[in-house]
Design a protein with these regions (language model features):
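Active-site His/acidic residue clusters
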Residues: 1-41, 45, 75
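Membrane-interface soluble catalytic domains
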Residues: 29-30, 36, 40, 44-55, ...
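Active-site-proximal beta-strand/loop segments in catalytic clefts of secreted hydrolases
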Residues: 13-18, 62-65, 98-100
Length: 151
């Protein structure tokens, strides 16, 4: 209803605790399945029910951060080690982007050939919104390159 009424230029959907897997791997897989289904449902809803947004919307699915490469020395009740968010590896994330002008068959980067970094997300969002130059020229972002610049 909110999307139909307001047809937002930018919508952020936070998928809380999707990555929690320490106590029950089956629940973790269920969380991933629900998140995947929810994202697909939102995309399909936009494309099929909101003509003003259909074929005029870009959706990005990205985590808020990665994890350190090496665990810390804190273990939970199931003897799983904890991971912080402080080394360069914590900036490595996946992203999935769909929308107009984006090749649906394009797949770039992998664990051994990384493309982009979490610092490229703000310029990417700004580019989609049409204000990248203003954002980059503000001096408040760590990178001037969007993911589109890197592909």
């Amino acid at each position: 209803e909110v999307m139909q009424r307001f047809k937002p230029t930018l919508t952020v959907i936070y998928l809380s605790n999707v990555d929690g897997c320490h106590s029950n791997f089956t629940n973790y897989l269920g969380s991933l399945h629900r998140a995947d289904h929810g994202v697909g449902h939102i995309w399909d809803y936009i494309q099929n029910n909101i003509p003003q947004m259909a074929n005029n919307t870009t959706m990005m699915v990205i985590p808020e951060h990665g994890r350190n490469l090496v665990s810390n020395n804190i273990e939970d009740g199931n003897a799983f080690s904890g991971y912080d968010h402080s080394d360069a590896n914590s900036r490595r994330i996946f992203s999935s982007i769909v929308g107009p002008g984006i090749d649906g068959n394009l797949s770039i980067g992998n664990e051994n050939n990384q493309v982009g970094d979490i610092v490229n997300l703000t310029p990417t969002i700004a580019e989609i919104l049409g204000c990248k130059d203003d954002v980059v020229n503000s001096g408040l972002v760590a990178s001037s390159k969007s993911l589109f610049d890197l592909i």
